[in-house]
Every structure is written in C-alpha cells, then in structure tokens.
Amino acid sequence: MPRATLPAEARLHRPSEFAAALKGRRLARGAFFIVSASPCAPADDQPARARLGLVIAKRFAARAVTRNTLKRVIREAFRARRLALPAQDYVVRLHSKLTPASLTALKRSARAEVDAHFTRIAR
C-alpha cells in the first residue's frame, strides 16, 4: 500500500528559504497561525510546486507533544491540498500562545483553521 507522506521536495530545508518566505507576502492570519509565502524558484529538471515550512516556537507551545501534533496536522492539511495551491514557498507560523486544551480539541481547531487558510489561498 502506498504511503501518504509529504515528500522531501515539498518541504523547505534551508534557513534562506524560510527567510525568503517569511519576508514575502502574508496570505492569511487566524487565531493561531500566520501563513506567509514567496514565489519559489523552479529547479532545472522539476517544475515549480508548492513547498511548506513550519515555525512552531517553544514559547507559544511549551510541550513537545503539542508542537509535534501541530506540525503533523499542518503537514497533513498541506499534503491534501498541495496540488491545488499556487507554486510558492509557504511558511505556517504559530503566532500566539495556545490555551490549555486536550490534544483532540487542539487537533480539531488547528485543522479547521489551517484548512480555511489553504482553501482561501487555493482560490
């Protein structure tokens, strides 16, 4: 059975890529997340495709379990909509402190917000 993963070429890796995307346009802002983007440079052998970077700061989500859960939820939302998004480098950044909640409630609210952001960007 094929695995539904986010391939390495769909992620930002270098600090310069993150910096360029964070300096780019802010596309969406919600209760927890800001989505910034900049045009990506296509490789010689590959067409330009949407790529994702995540910035989840420890000061906003103190527990490692919470940070990893947020990253997992955001990556899954991006993977589901990656082909519908314009070919840009996206950075999703947590911008406010999370209120204490169960992981189930956190997953639900984070997924709803990120889905709304990516749906708006895809239009």
From Swiss-Prot:
It comes from the Bacteria. PROSITE patterns: RIBONUCLEASE_P. GO terms for biological process: tRNA 5'-leader removal. GO terms for molecular function: 3'-tRNA processing endoribonuclease activity; ribonuclease P activity; tRNA binding. GO terms for cellular component: ribonuclease P complex. The keyword RNA-binding applies. The keyword tRNA processing applies. Disulfide bonds: none annotated. This is Ribonuclease P protein component. Keywords: Endonuclease, Hydrolase, Nuclease, RNA-binding, tRNA processing. The gene is rnpA. RNaseP catalyzes the removal of the 5'-leader sequence from pre-tRNA to produce the mature 5'-terminus. It can also cleave other RNA substrates such as 4.5S RNA. The protein component plays an auxiliary but essential role in vivo by binding to the 5'-leader sequence and broadening the substrate specificity of the ribozyme. Consists of a catalytic RNA component (M1 or rnpB) and a protein subunit. Pfam families: Ribonuclease_P. Its EC number is 3.1.26.5. It catalyses: Endonucleolytic cleavage of RNA, removing 5'-extranucleotides from tRNA precursor. PANTHER family: RIBONUCLEASE P PROTEIN COMPONENT. NCBIfam families: PRK00038.1, rnpA. Belongs to the RnpA family.
